[in-house]
Amino acid sequence: EKDNTNAHICLLAKTEEGRRPLNDALSEANLTGFYGRPRVDIPLLLSLPRDDLWVTTACVAYWQYPDIDDITRRLADHFGSNFFLEVQAHNTDKQVMLNQHILELHAKTGIPLVMGCDSHYILEEDAQIRSDFLLSKGMNYPDEEGWYMDYPDGETVYERFARQGVLTHSQIVEAMENTNRFLAVEEYDGHREPPFTGRGGDLGILQSE
């Protein structure tokens, strides 16, 4: 029987030492982990360098497996303070129940909270453009009522969490402030790609073709 179950996770490279293994993991997922789509399994995640990546539990699509709490603890043990439980401010029963569960897990484990947005466009008025685009591709998501898909400012995010009524003031502030930790990325000038010299080192061949 086919099992197409999949879960989301957010991986962010802090440094070049994090980016390269992350790219390697994605390549490995395409080469040996492809089942319906490229898949990164738990051993591959746990092989990534703990100090050079940030990891968050992303959206509701992370919590798909019955043993996901145990998986979350394993990932938190590996990535330490670079691992976050992501809360979002959607006005839906599903997100409310998930945030309640996340807070329980946060209280038990001490894994820090971080705020995330499920942004599919920038401004609220762009929603129709996205709908038209999905329609042109024959795609339809019937259960999007109450889901915020714009890219809001901080004041709007806070107001949405407050209306949701799950997180306390201090928890909302903690989750929002923790997003600032992602600003501490390695900056560098120039390109890191290997030099491209063309087939056999002769660009004239490519130009002639």
Residue ranges of predicted features:
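Phosphodiester-processing cores and adjacent nucleic acid-binding clamps
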Residues: 1-209
